[in-house]
């Protein structure tokens, strides 16, 4: 987002999920379908791109999550609609998914997104429901199809060692792994219960690689102009670097989040929404001050921010 005129959308399609994990926040999943009509979604894509282009952002990254996004019956069609925009010279897509669909579904996803600049997936492994071998096979299928995959493992403190060992087995197969600290039910802080060694593992474990080389997905620049690379946004939470109140932030101007029908500037910000998918929304025309005391969502923390001294 620093190098390209890229507009970022983080989209929770709904809370409907085919899993019900014991550690999931109660408000983050539902067994009742809550998706909107297909035309509501396609109209939103078109309107976001129109307003973003008016702000000078001509390239796009859309990230879909839930709930479980693939549980939406027309999600494959929605991905195809988004991907078939040949006006944008750069388009990328990201999914956060439990990989529950079968090989055929993912084959269609690979084919329908093959022309995009970048495709990536956060594959959330949930030990209460997933089969380790089948899950690994889907990851390998996607990687061989040119999709950047990282397994996301919520590191529940009381199961830390078990989960770490399984993540090591995935890493041995050449699959990237992200160790995600568990947040409290309000999603405002990391839970207690981690040892110092476990904190170190969260901060440094499993560097991200692509085609045999370590990659950096975020950059920080200090007041002296020194650059620091991070291979994944979750490192910021692991290090506790997530307090940006009064920084100037591009959220709402170069990005937006969609949660249900609400369009907001960020997950962590508690101000009024920018609008809704059904009644309309308006993006900011310029960067604005951060208003939240803690920014624990990686979707928020990766948006460009500047701290002006004085």
What are these model-predicted stretches?
Residues 2-43, 268:
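Canonical Radical SAM [4Fe-4S] cluster-binding loop centered on the CxxxCxxC motif
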Residues 25, 48-51, 59, 223:
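Glycine-rich short-loop/terminal segments
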Residues 28-39, 56-72, 86-104, 113-134, ...:
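Core AdoMet radical
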Residues 51-54, 82-86, 108-118, 137-146, ...:
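Acidic (Asp/Glu)-rich catalytic clusters
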Residues 118, 130-229, 233:
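Conserved C-terminal portion of the radical SAM core fold
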Residues 188-310:
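Accessory C-terminal segments flanking Radical SAM cores
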């Amino acid at each position: 987002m620093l190098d390209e005129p890229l507009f970022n959308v983080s989209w929770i399609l709904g809370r409907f999920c085919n899993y019900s994990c014991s550690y999931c926040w109660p408000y983050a999943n539902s067994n009742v379908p809550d998706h909107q009509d297909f035309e509501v979604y396609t109209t939103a894509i078109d309107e976001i791109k129109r307003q973003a282009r008016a702000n000078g952002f001509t390239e796009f990254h859309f990230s879909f999550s839930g709930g479980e996004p693939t549980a939406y019956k027309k999600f494959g069609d929605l991905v195809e609609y988004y991907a078939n925009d040949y006006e944008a010279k750069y388009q990328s897509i990201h999914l956060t998914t439990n990989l529950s669909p079968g090989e055929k579904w993912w084959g269609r996803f690979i084919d329908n997104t093959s022309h995009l600049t970048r495709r990536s997936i956060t594959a959330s492994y949930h030990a209460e429901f997933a089969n380790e071998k089948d899950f690994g096979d889907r990851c390998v299928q996607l990687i061989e199809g040119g999709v950047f995959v990282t397994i996301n493992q919520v590191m529940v403190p009381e199961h830390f060692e078990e989960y770490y060992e399984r993540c090591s087995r995935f890493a041995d197969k050449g699959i990237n792994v992200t160790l995600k600290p568990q947040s409290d039910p309000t999603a405002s802080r990391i839970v207690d219960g981690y040892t110092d060694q476990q904190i170190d593992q969260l901060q440094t474990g499993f560097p991200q690689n692509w085609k045999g080389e370590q990659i950096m997905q975020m950059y920080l620049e200090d007041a002296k102009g020194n650059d620091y690379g991070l291979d994944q946004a979750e490192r910021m939470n692991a290090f506790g670097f997530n307090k940006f109140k009064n920084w100037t932030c591009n959220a709402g101007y170069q990005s937006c989040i969609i949660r249900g029908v609400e369009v907001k500037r960020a997950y962590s910000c508690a101000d009024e929404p920018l609008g809704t998918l059904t009644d309309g929304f308006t993006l900011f025309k310029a960067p604005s001050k951060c208003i939240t005391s803690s920014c624990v969502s990686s979707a928020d923390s990766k948006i460009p921010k500047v701290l002006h001294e004085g």
